[in-house]
Amino acid sequence: MLCEQVLGKLHDFDTTGKTIEYVDIEWHEAFKKIHKKITDKGTEVGIRMDDSILARGLYQDDVIYADDEKLVVVNTPPCEVIRVSLTSGHEKMSAKVCYEIGNRHAPLFWGENDTFITIYNEPMLVMLQKIHGVQAEKEVLKLDFDKRISASINNHHH
C-alpha cells in the first residue's frame, strides 16, 4: 500500500464500518518524506510524501490512506521528554530556558500548567537542572504538535 498525501484528520472522516489502522511515526521521523512501516494490524505501508511534508510534518491522527473499508492513520508514540517548570518568583527565567533549548536546536512545546516540554537527552536535563529557579524532570508522554513553540521540529544535533 502506498500513501502519498495527508487526506485530513481522523475526526473529519466517517469511520462507520471502517477498519482504522495506525502507523507509528516517531517525533523525529515526522518531517521525512519516505517511510516503510507496518501498521498495528500488520499491513505493510510505503509512505512517499511530497516536499510540503518537510514543513508540515506528519502528526497524530493524520489520515494518510482512505478507502471504503480502511483508514490508515498516523500515531505519534509517547517518548522521553523533559518537563520544565519555573519556581514561583523566577518566571523571567523562561527566557533563559527557551534560549538554552533553542541554542541546542531542540524542539520546544508548551506543556500543561505553564510548563515547557522538550525532547529528553541527559546533557539537556543536567543543564536545565542547573539553572536557578528552574525545575526539570524526565517523563514519558505523547507530544502535542499543536502546542509546539519551535518553528521547526527536527532531530538536529551539533
Can you say where each PLM-predicted feature lies in the sequence?
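Residues forming anionic-ligand binding surfaces in small-molecule and nucleic-acid pockets
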Residues: 99-111
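Helix-rich terminal scaffold detector
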Residues: 1-20, 41, 114-158
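Short amphipathic alpha-helix segments
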Residues: 58, 86-101
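Short, structured beta-strand/loop micro-motifs enriched in basic residues and often containing a Trp
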Residues: 39-53
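Short glycine-/aliphatic-rich beta-strand segments at the starts of folded cytosolic domains
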Residues: 73-87
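Short, surface-exposed secondary-structure boundary micro-motifs
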Residues: 63, 68-69
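Short, well-ordered loop/turn sites that connect or cap secondary structure elements
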Residues: 55-58, 64
